[in-house]
Amino acid sequence: MPPVALGVLTEAILENTMNHDIELQQAVQAELGWEPSVVAAHIGVTANAGVVTLTGHVETYASKFAAETAARRVKGVKAVAEEIEVKLPYDIKRSDEDIAAAAIDRLAWDVCVPPDAIKVMVQDGRATLTGEVGWHYQQEAAEQDVRRLYGVIGVTNHVSIKPTVNVSNLSDDIAHALHRSWYFDPNTIAISADAGKVRLTGTARSPHEKQIAALTAWSAPGVTAVENDITLN
């Protein structure tokens, strides 16, 4: 190909990529504006080849989580780099002791969390959860309970999952569940499992489908970890 033609082609590709980035940026901004728990005016959005970066500040950790979730569900988003800062208003600041006490109370009232299974440590508004549960949904419920509390600016979930059932047919069980779903073609997702640890490979059409595949795997009895290596096509 002549140098001039190659240069024109390269310029066209770059222009197309730039236009896609602008469209994706605008789509994410629109989705943030559509999310009632997020003040979109406080969040900056940039996009580069499907990777979206969020900056700015919010007043609660729950809003920060909601902003990231909103960005992930936009078509064309491959990954989200989240750099949002939580700036608590003075009237909702809480001491670490108050946050820990509130977290313990919230967990105790949640029917999805086994009694006395979770321990909470809070330092400078950042909560760390430890303990052991039998299911992923219990692990997620505990984190959800704590991230919505006043004064929390971050949550680290170190709760482990201890399988309580035989996991010998784990790959087959997950494969059957995926194949029952209208989201997936049986030939697009591969599953491997070793003693409760599951790895997903293959392709999905969107981050949402990729997430659904992981949630489906987590629903299988005995799963302790899911490595989601599904790529987007």
Describe each model-derived feature in a short phrase:
Residues 1-233:
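N-terminal targeting leaders
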